[in-house]
Amino acid sequence: MVTDKTNASSSSLVDTPADETEVQPPINRRPTFLDRLMRRQTSPSSMEYSESDKKKDGPMENEQSKGVRESSLPPLSQLSLKGYKSSTKRRLLDDELASNIRNLLPARLQLFDEWDLVYSLEQHGVSLNTLYQRSNPDYQLSQLRKNKPEVGYGDSVISSMMSGNVNSMRERRRPQGYVLIIKDENNSKFGCFVNEHLRPMDQKRYYGNGECFLWKSELFTPSPSNSNSEEDISSHLATPQIRFKAFMYTGINDNIIYSNHDFIAIGSSKGQNGLWIDRSLYNGVSYSCDTFGNEILNSNSGDAKIGKFKIMGLELWRVGTLE
């Protein structure tokens, strides 16, 4: 047994042949997770990476660098709203409202730059069953294929042989979401985003996940600052502005979506729904509920306890492709 004298910092003993006079210095290697764990156990006061660990393992991403990285991402492409007829007069969705909703969607759905109108009270008539039918992805896909130009016999045979049932399964897994927009008798706009298509449930079972949220677009008059002149104050008072509010899933309960042949309910606690509309698609009510921690959707008053409303317009938009 001999001591490695070529490396003064090394105090370990190594086995060498009798004729070997020099030991190779240890190879510098990247510390493993186990190495770092052992160091932390020997130094209980150190709960974070040391400076040497940061140099070896690469720079740690802090909040500032993360913000710079996110701000450097390219902006989303211009959104296109498809489905309005030229004769449709009461259009509930505009670019500004769509952009506000889009910014809160899951990242995979924000990338879609086309939204498709699935159901409109004005264009498709007043019927809850029609809303359910048109929100079904299978029905939407059949309508899409029906409107496609016909292909030759050979192309259709090859396409069916290559796709088969595999494509059918994939189509159902494509990312989709739906935006519901309601306009009441006071011209207030509000609604929800749901991650699944609306459908009648035979049993009382909630569906949907934490990506769902409620929203409202309300008019308000901004309070003028003290530095404003009387002319500026009067102009502010005369020009109400639109304020968009969203109420995200709180996780308190899983009562996200429930729908049947009599009503649609979004969010529920203590027998009260964040948004509820009846089978006539005319009467509705909004309560504050634990599911979303929301305000009354059709009221600008923060102390309102219940918000009954009449539906003057209703639209359902699909975000995501069918094939």
From Swiss-Prot:
A GO biological-process term: response to oxidative stress
GO cellular component: mitochondrion; nucleus
UniProt KW keywords: Mitochondrion
Matches recorded under SMART domains: TLDc (SM00584)
Residue ranges annotated for the TLDc domain, each copy included: 91-320
Stored InterPro entries: TLDc_dom
Biased composition (Basic and acidic residues): 51-69
Subcellular location: Mitochondrion
Chief location category: mitochondrion
Biased composition (Low complexity): 71-81
Region of interest (Disordered), ranges: 1-81
Biased composition (Polar residues): 1-14, 40-49
UniProt cross-references to PANTHER family, sorted A to Z: MUSTARD, ISOFORM V (PTHR23354:SF62), NUCLEOLAR PROTEIN 7/ESTROGEN RECEPTOR COACTIVATOR-RELATED (PTHR23354)
Membership in a protein family: Belongs to the OXR1 family.
Protein function: May be involved in protection from oxidative damage.
Record protein name field: Oxidation resistance protein 1
Organism: Debaryomyces hansenii (strain ATCC 36239 / CBS 767 / BCRC 21394 / JCM 1990 / NBRC 0083 / IGC 2968) (Yeast)
Gene: OXR1
